[in-house]
Amino acid sequence: MAKVNLIESPYSLLQLKGIGPKKIEVLQQLNIHTVEDLVLYLPTRYEDNTVIDLNQAEDQSNVTIEGQVYTAPVVAFFGRNKSKLTVHLMVNNIAVKCIFFNQPYLKKKIELNQTITVKGKWNRVKQEITGNRVFLNSQGTQTQENADVQLEPVYRIKEGIKQKQIRDQIRQALNDVTIHEWLTDELREKYKLETLDFTLNTLHHPKSKEDLLRARRTYAFTELFLFELRMQWLNRLEKSSDEAIEIDYDLDQVKSFIDRLPFELTEAQKSSVNEIFRDLKAPIRMHRLLQGDVGSGKTVVAAICMYALKTAGYQSALMVPTEILAEQHAESLIALFGDSMNVALLTGSVKGKKRKILLEQLENRTIDCLIGTHALIQDDVIFHNVGLVITDEQHRFGVNQRQLLREKGAMTNVLFMTATPIPRTLAISVFGEMDVSSIKQLPKGRKPIITTWAKHEQYDKVLMQMTSELKKGRQAYVICPLIESSEHLEDVQNVVALYESLQQYYGVSRVGLLHGKLSADEKDEVMQKFSNHEIDVLVSTTVVEVGVNVPNATFMMIYDADRFGLSTLHQLRGRVGRSDQQSYCVLIASPKTETGIERMTIMTQTTDGFELSERDLEMRGPGDFFGVKQSGLPDFLVANLVEDYRMLEVARDEAAELIQSGVFFENTYQHLRHFVEENLLHRSFD
């Protein structure tokens, strides 16, 4: 089937007035290849040309004023080809001096007693406006587009095309296209939405702020609705082929394993285990997200599930994003399982004969549980009968990587784990219909980490506090944002310089260095020394953000903490507080922005990762929270997942009803269904 368009035009781009081969090249750089693309190329913002009352105008604000010229314009030249034109206006009985730099031609256009409209920066003290645009009344020649356009669309453009040109070309296109409605009359009436025709025309040429708000609301809902139709349809297709073998685990053996654990499970852990076990008994494949705050005990839950698979005769796989984390998981699971399970580690560092033997053992089921990095998804990694695939910190992998691991078993159950609690909005968008288990309870005996914020000039006091902890036999992390100094970020501390400074302070043998440029063997050596308490202080970049577990570490200093988002800061902080000893986290930062100050304040107020994830999403937006490409989120033109989260839930419910009821597959939705199928359904946002 050919590509289905919801916007159809009788013309090609080349047939539009003002578009030739050179313009086509520029438009293609803007990803505009068809008339439909042009119509859907929406403004990034709007310039407000509404004339303002000067009595209400704030000093140094950008304003639009209208007044009568009462002195002839005067031009003064200075420097090399520079000029300054001065003219005086009477604006509602207020004498205003207008200055235009490097626009001497305006002298011939502005006449005495003429009414003109000026846009520029207002100086309240001097009663002066520095103009950047001027509109003349109907008696004069207009130097810009008509000032009657109160809201002027502004587009992202490139060299070779001007704002006026793209506005004119979009206006031409809108006059001739046929726009098929994306929403039914019933949906539009139910949620008081506009037609797509009105919406697109208004987004490009708004007549009022009220119209623009209505159009943006309609388009935002439409984007979210189409996205959710795609998600719900994919879920339907996935579940239709989601038969699974029932995992007939030995409950008595599992209970015995839990009883042998050196600690008692929290109620949240027990609840999560029960939810996962119910999924394993179900006739369809499990798709579950296990989310829990740092140190909440997700790995133990995963271990119990792996053990259950072993009792049923199946293998398990655990994929993590880094080698350090893979090694730590392997160590902790081997300690938990003892001789009851054969655990193996496969990373990029495992090569040659060792790798060959491991793969043979995996295929003949000598290995019960395989832990590794993306090396697990390589073609030569063949399981005998894998029944459970676990992906830790799953948002750090692309959708395709996760799918490849899942396909290692024909009827494999899938468990995703994350220590970055997912805000509800993103959970709906990224994980769709996936079931979610949450561990919001920390193990008994854990004390909340005391977090404080210090300015750079208080560094010596922080150092004294860290030294006090070291004297108690504890260990400490020191985190920096950069590996080496940068000429672009001269005021940001780098890990190498701080490492050398602390070596001088504490002695060379007591301080270790960890960063991403070290080889896997070098990282492993440093981490082993820190884990074995051969070094007291580990100076590191964010490579320790996830998973590193050293219970004796009770102090963390994060240098230039304002350079990190809330979720990253919280993950870093989670490296301490992993025992019954009191732990401390000190944020060293002198933020210059309100956002930076707010982040530091929030971090000192709460240690709740779920609350922090919501605040982080509000401050950074969904694109930065995961990274759009990593998360599978589309880049919406109008919709905002933070601001429009209620609308997202409504769109999701409506899409789910259409798909699940089967109404979407009736003739009424034929055009929209073909559009979603041909343009969205199998599109990857990775």
Curated annotation (Swiss-Prot):
Pfam families: DEAD, Helicase_C, RecG_dom3_C, RecG_wedge. One of its GO terms (biological process) is DNA repair. One of its GO terms (molecular function) is DNA helicase activity. PROSITE patterns: HELICASE_ATP_BIND_1 (PS51192), HELICASE_CTER (PS51194). It is an enzyme of class 5 (isomerase). The keyword DNA damage applies. A motif (DEAH box) lies at residues 392-395. Keywords: ATP-binding, DNA damage, DNA recombination, DNA repair, DNA-binding, Helicase, Hydrolase, Isomerase, Nucleotide-binding. Residues 50-149 are annotated as: Wedge domain. The keyword Plastid does not apply. ATP binds at residues 292-299. Residues 462-618 form the Helicase C-terminal domain. CDD domains: DEXHc_RecG, RecG_wedge_OBF. Plays a critical role in recombination and DNA repair. Helps process Holliday junction intermediates to mature products by catalyzing branch migration. Has replication fork regression activity, unwinds stalled or blocked replication forks to make a HJ that can be resolved. Has a DNA unwinding activity characteristic of a DNA helicase with 3'-5' polarity. Monomer. The wedge domain within the N-terminus inserts into the replication fork junction, where the lagging and leading strand split. This is ATP-dependent DNA helicase RecG. It comes from Staphylococcus aureus (strain MRSA252). The gene is recG.
